[in-house]
């Protein structure tokens, strides 16, 4: 593998991160439902609730590690190669730049948001964690999905002449 292979690696890491972000949200929402059932007397055993919280944590930690790997590969690639230009005209170019110009500022915002969300979770301050997560989750998910879309538009659907 060479540095030239990093765009596909980056897209793959973003796609994997997306899956774990979605999985983490599904598990925490299922955990909330289980918690409500325990509170309302429908369930007496809270082991299911703790299992869902643990699965949420595993998914989110995995998403964080995969995203950190992505950021490392992204910085290596962009340090080594110039920016790839989108060369198509018409509606593909309009859609590409709409996606790109929303992706970039949200990607920049996502790093501090993720940090501000993870730190309270590590410190077991879950109310503060939830307050930040309400903002972090949609931003992180959007950035992960649009990162894959940017790759697909640049290298697969509308590649410049001479690219793969």
Question: Can you say where each PLM-predicted feature lies in the sequence?
Answer:
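Alpha-helical membrane insertion/targeting regions
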Residues: 1-164
